[in-house]
């Protein structure tokens, strides 16, 4: 099995605590308001804590339509969130899973930095192409910025 790691850092004027609340704790109610149409449907199996599964269907027409996320850990005090993508066409047929570690770090100006480390576990010696990582970064950044704008407005 191959392993590939990628880090995405996004800055925000919104506090780390408020981003964490919207991005992690209340994401299932906030994201549909912040980015209507980002998801076609989300089926949740569990209480939102570790072991919870989120089966996500994305809108028609995109290159990715399905993914299943497993919540691995939520730490409200440390502002960390761990989850894995374990199923769906997002895995492209050559990725076993994508392990994600999210840390919200407060900044001196009252804002925050959202640091996401994605660890791609690939089949054999497969390598995730750079264009796929770029596409994921663009999608994740757009969702983060939509969430940030919603939190600022509300």
From Swiss-Prot:
GO terms for molecular function: abscisic acid binding; protein phosphatase inhibitor activity; signaling receptor activity. Keywords: Allergen, Pathogenesis-related protein, Plant defense. InterPro entries: Bet_v_I/MLP, Bet_v_I_allergen, Plant_def-hormone_signal, START-like_dom_sf. It comes from the Eukaryota. One of its GO terms (biological process) is abscisic acid-activated signaling pathway. It holds the Pfam family Bet_v_1. GO terms for cellular component: cytoplasm; nucleus. Belongs to the BetVI family. This is Major allergen Api g 1, isoallergen 1.
